[in-house]
């Protein structure tokens, strides 16, 4: 029986086969969270590892998406995505309306957990 994770791995590998796909975010090129285990088979040449700067990461993703790249941008916790709200709401969301073109961005967001380590209230505000 296939698991949800198996299907995520399958979909990430499928997207990685496309020449214009790039993976952006924290712990993409360097493993460190459960999301990074879904792209272990993806070439490091298709990854841009970022520090913790969520708004800039989303801005980069929007910009890359404008160049016809298919961007999969990783946010290890959903509450990190809130920090990128400006780029998401004022740019990515409005891009097609403003220009007539699509910006191809897929946002992957993780849900906080407390196992094996409790990350505290800032990182599991589920």
Q: Where does each model-flagged region fall?
A:
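Thiamine diphosphate
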Residues: 1-126
């Amino acid at each position: 029986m296939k698991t949800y994770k198996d299907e995520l791995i399958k979909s990430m590998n499928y997207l990685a086969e496309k020449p214009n796909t790039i993976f952006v975010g924290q712990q993409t090129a360097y493993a460190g969270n459960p999301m990074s285990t879904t792209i272990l088979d993806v070439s490091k040449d298709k990854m841009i590892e970022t520090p913790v700067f969520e708004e800039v990461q989303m801005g980069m993703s929007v910009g890359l998406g404008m160049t016809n790249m298919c961007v999969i941008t990783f946010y290890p916790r959903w509450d990190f995505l809130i920090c990128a709200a400006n780029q998401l709401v004022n740019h990515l969301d409005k891009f097609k309306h403003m220009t007539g073109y699509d910006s191809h961005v897929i946002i992957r967001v993780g849900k906080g957990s407390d196992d094996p380590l409790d990350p505290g209230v800032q990182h599991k505000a589920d």
